[in-house]
A protein has these predicted regions:
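The conserved Walker
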Residues: 51-55
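Conserved pre-motif I regulatory segment
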Residues: 2-50
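Short aromatic/basic micro-patch
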Residues: 32, 60, 129
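Walker A/P-loop NTP-binding motif
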Residues: 35-47, 58-72, 85-88, 92-97, ...
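Long, low-complexity, intrinsically disordered polar/charged segments
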Residues: 1-9, 64-80, 84
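Conserved nucleic-acid-binding Ia/Ib motif block in the N-terminal RecA-like helicase ATPase lobe
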Residues: 17-20, 24-27, 73-143, 148-151
Length: 155
């Protein structure tokens, strides 16, 4: 990182609750992908980013998503992942980032009873993370409504 880049999460103008959650997770400085992406996402720009595994890509989109979610209790962000394992991993990470906020995230994927997911979706979920097949199933059943989606992430 150069001296002109943001060096601490607090300097990225993040909510104190998010900075606190990141500190609890053991993170003090953003990775290069996070330092590059977070400000652009917070400014409302579309971002296409690529980085190696383990560089913090999930937090690069998860942090600004959590910061941008409003108190409205409807789905505001949709994150699509290719596998159920990644959906679970992303949901856990986003939930940790938003643990001090009132943001609710839910993974939806096949291989699990859909009824359980339908019930959970009624609990004011704001971020849904899922695999394409299960997301299509929910959309066709009208258990996921896309009316209020402000953010779409293809992971």
């Amino acid at each position: 990182m150069t001296n002109t880049q943001k060096e601490l999460f607090g300097e990225l103008l993040l909510d104190k609750k998010i900075v606190s959650a990141l500190t609890e997770m053991g993170f003090e400085e953003p990775s290069p992908i996070q330092a590059a992406a977070i400000p652009f996402v917070l400014e409302g720009h579309d971002v296409i980013a690529q980085a190696q595994t383990g560089t913090g890509k999930t937090a690069a989109f998860g942090i600004p998503l959590v910061q941008s979610i409003t108190d409205h209790r409807h789905i505001q962000a949709l994150i699509m992942t290719p596998t159920r394992e990644l959906a679970i991993q992303v949901a856990e990470e986003v939930s940790k980032i938003g643990r001090n906020s009132r943001v609710k995230a839910l993974p939806v994927y096949g291989g699990q009873p859909i009824e359980r997911q339908i019930k959970a979706l009624k609990n004011n979920v704001q971020i849904v993370i899922g695999t394409p097949g299960r997301l299509i199933d929910h959309i066709n059943r009208r258990t996921i409504k896309l009316d209020h989606i402000k953010f779409l992430v293809l992971d």
